[in-house]
């Protein structure tokens, strides 16, 4: 059908990327893909590119009316090797223009975490794309809307180039032997 664009969750991309070779159809044109709904492993980007797909990862929530971050390609990355390109592509990205502000902040003191790619904080969003509250649930609204920010519950780091990368959902962190272990890191190994 000569499609040029489609959207699919990482699980769909994984199914396409791991289709047996004898069932794969060779594309003679590039297909652009938007993926969201979960943090995709970097290997998916590499495999999809080999099949002729150009994948962009975006991030958003129901509470933010669509995506608020996009992993927009930076031409400085053109010189990187394919593994490095795939790793960068798996990040959630930078603020989408329709969103007033997105930061990775320490929820305890509401300070922005350093752009070091290591310090974990919570993704917080504000702007006219953020919901006003949960329908008939004042407690949930009060818990998620504090200090003028929507608290996403997603734990992330901010890289030196300003790109945000999710490490886990706060409720999915595994604590073992006093260490915080990311369920996403386990899934990606």
Q: Over which residues does each language-model region extend?
A:
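A conserved hydrophobic position in a structured secondary element of the catalytic/binding core
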Residues: 8, 40, 125-126, 136
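Conserved beta-loop-beta connector loops within the AMP-binding
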Residues: 95, 101-124, 160-161
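Gly/Ser/Thr-rich phosphate-binding loop
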Residues: 3-8, 17-87, 100-101, 110, ...
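Alpha-helix capping/helix-boundary segments
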Residues: 11-13, 40, 130
């Amino acid at each position: 059908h000569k499609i040029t664009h489609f959207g699919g969750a990482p699980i769909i991309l994984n199914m396409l990327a791991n289709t047996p070779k004898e069932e794969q159809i060779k594309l003679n044109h590039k297909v652009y893909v938007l993926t969201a709904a979960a943090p995709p492993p970097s290997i998916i980007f590499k495999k999809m590119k080999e099949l002729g797909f150009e994948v962009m990862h975006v991030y958003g929530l129901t509470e933010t009316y669509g995506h608020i971050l996009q992993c927009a390609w930076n031409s400085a990355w053109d010189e990187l090797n394919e593994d490095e390109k795939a790793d960068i592509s798996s990040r959630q990205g930078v603020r989408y223009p329709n969103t007033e502000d997105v930061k990775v902040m320490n929820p305890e003191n509401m300070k922005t975490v350093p752009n070091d790619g290591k310090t974990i904080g919570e993704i917080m969003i504000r702007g006219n794309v953020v919901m006003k509250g949960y329908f008939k649930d004042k407690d949930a609204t009060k818990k998620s809307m504090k200090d003028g920010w929507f608290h996403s519950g997603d734990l992330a780091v901010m890289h030196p180039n300003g790109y945000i990368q999710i490490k886990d959902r706060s409720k999915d962190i595994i604590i073992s032997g006093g260490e915080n272990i990311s369920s996403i890191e386990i899934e990606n190994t």
